[in-house]
Amino acid sequence: MSKFGVFLPVSGRAASRQTLMQAAQRAEALGYDSVWAADRLVMPWKIDTTYPYSKEATFIVPPDRPFFDTLTCLAFLAGCTERIQLGMSVMVMPYRHPLHWAKIATTIDQLSTGRLILGVGVGWMEEEFAAMNAPFKERGKVSDEQLTLLQRLWTEEHINFHGAYYRVEDIAFNPKPYQKPRLPIWVGGEGMHAQRRAARYGDAWFPYFVRITPRRLLDGFENVRREAQTTGRNPDEVKLACCLPVELTSADAPPIEEYLKGSVKQVAERLRQFIDVGVAHIGLQFMIPHYPERQEQIERFAEEALPALKAYQR
């Protein structure tokens, strides 16, 4: 049975304690399986880096608007919800020291009794890397080393690690995650490097595609499975999940093969095609800039389509 989640209002004018809590609690009541928080630490006033996750290729949140911290938001929601999974989509690993953010993530997993999904990525905005004094060109290697260290932190008692970027000498790291044997790692990113990272370290490949067909998504996942096999892993240990933008319309819209736009019925039909190729979990980002209208779409989709989609079997 496939699962469905929605993105949280962690940025923009709507970002507040009350809307964040209401959005998560309402998603839980409506039957969504997960809520997702995006990650941004600073917002440069001038961004030349191409944004890969919008049709216009420009970042969608102005720099003078709030953007809450993803880890803090999920820690807050651990105490405001009971069942829904709490996900990062995705946390940029090179911005933070792995001992620090792993401690926070493990604490959230304990406080939520095992509901955290650790969505991780290497980042894309060179200007933000510069502000954080983080190595943009080495972000992939830094991220891989962090993921290697995490495995030690969550499974060993006397931890020693000597890497190119991080060194640890005989430390303890407790508590361990609530989930066993460790937190689920969902590796974001769309290209071959991300696919290899998911195959080596991930419990899921978790790309965000603005435009994608189920067939193309499956092609990418088959790359992940092949890479997993070459590393000696069982390919079945890595599942397929993804985030997809959604534009709901009041009436049927002309079909667009690579984009989820149309009536609730049209979007649900397209999502069934993603289930058919084996997508286990889909995070839906409803592309409405104003929060009240966005929440209305989240409610309408849940009432008119979600139960049948969750029950649909490929």
Question: Locations of the language-model features?
Answer:
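Active-site-adjacent structural elements that line small-molecule/cofactor binding pockets in enzymes
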Residues: 1-314
